[in-house]
Regions:
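Active-site-proximal acidic segments at structured loop/helix or strand boundaries
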Residues: 80
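Hydrophobic alpha-helical transmembrane segments
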Residues: 2-75, 83, 87-89, 95, ...
Length: 126
């Protein structure tokens, strides 16, 4: 592997490429749309319920982890589809594993959300 010199221009381009990836994720991936819709609801609810700094940290980390995992999953699926457009059992397992990782993070994020939001919602009725 070639050692390249540090270049500000290259660093700027890397952010540009990453930004394009984020735009592609939220504009073309249906599952990411769902995650974004939930994100908006959670942020609004958090603002209305007055989350603490640490609660916001947990929420933001969960949101970021799920969206990042969805991005990696989408990239793996796109690469698998390009490499093997026809059905392949190994490709199926690879895609299932990537999707499973997103599911695990999403479920854990729901649990974190329940731990944070349920007590706050219940306190509104007491």
């Amino acid at each position: 592997m070639e050692n390249k010199r540090f270049s500000i221009k290259d660093r700027i381009y890397s952010f540009k490429y990453a930004g394009r990836g984020v735009v592609r994720l939220v504009s073309r991936e249906h599952n990411a749309w769902r995650h974004c819709a939930v994100t908006v609801c959670v942020i609004v609810a958090g603002g209305l319920l007055g989350l603490s700094t640490f609660e916001w940290i947990a929420v933001v980390l969960c949101i970021g982890a799920v969206l990042a995992a969805e991005g990696v999953n989408s990239a793996i699926e796109a690469l698998c589809d390009k490499v093997s457009p026809e059905y392949d059992e190994a490709i199926k397992h690879t895609k299932d594993l990537a999707a499973g990782a997103v599911l695990i993070l999403a479920v854990m994020s729901v649990i974190v959300g329940l731990l944070i939001f349920v007590p706050k919602i219940l306190s509104l009725f007491h």
